[in-house]
Design a protein with these regions (language model features):
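Pro/Thr/Ser/Gly-rich low-complexity, intrinsically disordered linker/stalk tracts
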Residues: 1-31, 86-91
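Recognizes extended acidic, P/S/T-rich segments that occur
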Residues: 28, 32-67, 73-85
Length: 91
């Protein structure tokens, strides 16, 4: 199971977003149902969050104008850990 079509504030790798706690959303491929996810940025790691939701409001305030790169990992309905997504960013 892997996250794809990853967006921040409905945009792919946006520049110039002016939001302290951005929304990140994704779709999943492989497996039947997402059971958990993890988001890892340069400075923050959500840890494994048990949820089928494919969106999160990142609860960390990031410095405006700084590029933040992140990856997402998913677990399926059998709690099988997937691979990290490709690296994404917002700035």
């Amino acid at each position: 199971m892997k996250a794809f079509n990853i967006k921040t504030e409905y945009l792919k790798n946006p520049l110039g977003i002016d939001i302290e706690n951005p929304r990140v959303m994704w779709n999943c491929e492989g497996g039947v149902t997402q059971n958990a996810y993890q988001i890892v940025t340069d400075d923050w790691d959500s840890g494994k969050i048990e949820s089928s939701s494919m969106r999160i409001v990142v609860p960390v305030k990031f410095e405006k104008g700084k590029r933040v790169t992140y990856r997402i990992k998913l677990w399926d309905e059998n709690d099988t850990e997937g691979d990290f997504s490709e690296e994404n960013f917002f700035e």
